[in-house]
């Protein structure tokens, strides 16, 4: 009996990297292939397609500074991870290795390259991440979520396929739920999230914005907010004082369904979040994470803002007064909310997992 080919999926240990890997894994398994995940220890927090039996943890390290000590530590950890990954390649003999970004993908992709195993990288950002940028010249094929990501590197043009960001089954199910435009007196459902790791700025700014809303609008609100454990008592006490109907939690396992059931999403603008908002088609207020060297979240938010599907607010401008004004304007304009939902859908790609699976299978078969 012939064993089905194995595809190794390498991803950093956060949702933005892991969820597209999971979506591709589901599609490849439907096609009769085997899959395994190579990642770092953070990924073990996530439930999903990849059980511990299907996961290999490889040592890795993110660059945390430019000092000689920090660079040396990173180099040593990546070298150790590459040694472990080389042994994995020898034992598992994958048909191809697919990387989804993050420094933990460097050891398995480098090891695959050294052993002559076909390689693909996928990047969900509007600006390619540093790990993928390093790997881009060394892999067989590059998949991007958006066109034009590597326009400044014409030498790579022959490797690039625009596939979109693969969506998990839960997102595809949520995408089938139409946007329910609220009437002027109807409940207004607002979801506040800060990415897979939470965001303290949401706990610092959103409560003050809610307090500044007109009492009639506050009474309409049904608020769901991701709040870190250390901020929970403070935020809950604030909303209790205002008598706001609010559900607070540090993490929502059913986030896709919650995205679909809300009228306005307030969030960071990680690549995965932006792709999911486009796929599901929901109006959003996006606050890019500041301080990134390549400003990837600012560019990601622009993908939705430029078509009218989102409002982008840079963090220095993200104040209680500004947020209250934006929420008040959206609540007073149901037609605008409906138009934003429709606009957001124009950037969604529901067939991305299939398109990426086609590319991976071709590279595994031909090496090109």
Swiss-Prot record:
It is an enzyme of class 2 (transferase). Signal peptide: none annotated. One of its GO terms (molecular function) is UDP-N-acetyl-D-glucosamine:N-acetylmuramoyl-L-alanyl-D-glutamyl-meso-2,6-diaminopimelyl-D-alanyl-D-alanine-diphosphoundecaprenol 4-beta-N-acetylglucosaminlytransferase activity. It is found in: Cell inner membrane. It is a peripheral membrane protein. Pfam families: Glyco_tran_28_C (PF04101), Glyco_transf_28 (PF03033). InterPro entries: GlcNAc_MurG, Glyco_trans_28_C, GlycoTrans_28_N. The keyword Nuclease does not apply. The keyword Oxidoreductase does not apply. Pathway: Cell wall biogenesis; peptidoglycan biosynthesis. GO terms for cellular component: plasma membrane. Disulfide bonds: none annotated. Keywords: Cell cycle, Cell division, Cell inner membrane, Cell membrane, Cell shape, Cell wall biogenesis/degradation, Glycosyltransferase, Membrane, Peptidoglycan synthesis, Transferase. Its EC number is 2.4.1.227. Its main location: membrane. It catalyses: di-trans,octa-cis-undecaprenyl diphospho-N-acetyl-alpha-D-muramoyl-L-alanyl-D-glutamyl-meso-2,6-diaminopimeloyl-D-alanyl-D-alanine + UDP-N-acetyl-alpha-D-glucosamine = di-trans,octa-cis-undecaprenyl diphospho-[N-acetyl-alpha-D-glucosaminyl-(1->4)]-N-acetyl-alpha-D-muramoyl-L-alanyl-D-glutamyl-meso-2,6-diaminopimeloyl-D-alanyl-D-alanine + UDP + H(+). HAMAP family: MurG (MF_00033). Belongs to the glycosyltransferase 28 family. MurG subfamily. This is UDP-N-acetylglucosamine--N-acetylmuramyl-(pentapeptide) pyrophosphoryl-undecaprenol N-acetylglucosamine transferase.
């Amino acid at each position: 009996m012939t064993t089905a080919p194995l595809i190794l999926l390498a991803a950093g240990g956060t949702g933005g990297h892991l969820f597209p890997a999971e979506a591709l894994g589901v599609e490849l398994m439907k096609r009769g292939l085997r899959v395994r995940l190579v990642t770092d220890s953070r990924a073990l927090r996530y439930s999903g397609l990849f059980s511990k039996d299907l996961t290999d943890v490889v040592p890795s390290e993110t660059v945390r500074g430019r000092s000689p000590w920090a660079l040396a530590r990173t180099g040593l950890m990546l070298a150790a991870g590459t040694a472990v990954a080389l042994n994995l390649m020898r034992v598992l003999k994958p048909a191809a290795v697919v990387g989804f970004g993050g420094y933990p993908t460097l050891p398995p992709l480098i090891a695959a390259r050294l052993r002559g195993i076909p390689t693909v990288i996928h990047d969900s950002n509007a600006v390619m991440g540093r790990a993928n940028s390093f790997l881009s010249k060394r892999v067989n094929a590059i998949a991007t979520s958006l066109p034009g990501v590597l326009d400044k590197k014409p030498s790579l043009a022959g490797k690039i396929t625009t596939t979109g960001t693969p969506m998990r089954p839960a997102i595809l199910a949520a995408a089938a739920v139409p946007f329910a435009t609220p009437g002027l007196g109807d409940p207004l459902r607002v979801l506040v999230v800060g990415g897979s790791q939470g965001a303290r700025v949401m706990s610092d700014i959103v409560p003050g914005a809610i307090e500044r809303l007109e009492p009639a609008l506050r009474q309409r609100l049904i608020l769901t907010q991701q709040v870190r454990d250390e901020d929970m008592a403070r935020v809950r006490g604030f909303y209790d004082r205002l008598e706001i109907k609010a559900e607070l939690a540090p993490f929502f396992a059913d986030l896709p369904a919650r995205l679909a059931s809300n009228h306005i999403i307030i969030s960071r603008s990680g690549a995965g979040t932006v792709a999911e908002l486009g796929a599901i088609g929901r109006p959003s207020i996006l606050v890019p994470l500041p301080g990134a060297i390549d400003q990837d979240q600012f560019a990601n938010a622009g993908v939705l803002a430029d078509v009218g599907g989102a409002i982008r607010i840079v963090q220095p401008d993200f104040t209680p007064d500004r947020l209250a004004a934006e929420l008040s304007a959206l609540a007073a304009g149901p037609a605008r909310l409906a138009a934003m939902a429709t606009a957001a859908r124009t950037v969604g790609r529901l067939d991305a997992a299939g398109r990426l699976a086609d590319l991976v299978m071709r590279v595994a078969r031909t090496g090109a």
